[in-house]
Amino acid sequence: MTTPIVDFVRRYAQSGTARLHMPGHKGQSLLGCEPWDITEIRGADELYEAEGIIAQSEANATRLFGTAHTYYSTEGSSQCIRAMLCLALQGAPRTGKRPVLLAARNAHKALLYAAALLDFDIRWLWPAPEDTGALCSCPVTVQALSAALEELAGQGRTPFGVYLTSPDYLGGMQDIAALSAVCDAHGVPLLVDNAHGAYLRFLPGGS
């Protein structure tokens, strides 16, 4: 696999070019990483309209992780969570009521920021009393998810998504296949914060 971004930045760092551009440290090493810290100079591509080395790197990552597409973000998973919810919200049922998201309670705070920014309600899926992992774990069973969806349906509300964190902060995994089947049966998208799961692709049976 090629490494187009690393190759470009290494060549630039070793070129001795006068840096008449941002950032202000001009590549002068203080912590050690500054020579590698550049902006959208010629050849460096542009993150949101990638056509060069970033596009090549994203294509490499797509093949590596076996995804349909891979896009790099400027703010890690928090930005990706907000983007995912924004896209899912576009398909929210137009009922005249505030959109509602069904979410496991161990969600990252980026979900709360998204709810404030995008103006939707959250209906929480709480951990079972016997779950010793408490909020850091919050496993969701097929039965609990089905019951929560049925309860919302009885109130005349259909969530625009079911939001889960898997793996969670303790390494626990949700049964994505089974929970996805429940969501499909109710016509509700399943949204997964998989920030801790990049390694899963490389395990037996990983995807």
Where are these regions (language model features)?
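N-terminal "arm"/small-domain region of PLP-dependent enzymes with the aminotransferase-like
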Residues: 1-52
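Conserved PLP-enzyme active-site core in the AAT-like
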Residues: 2-10, 56, 75-207
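Short acidic/polar alpha-helix capping motifs at helix-coil junctions
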Residues: 22-26, 72, 142-144
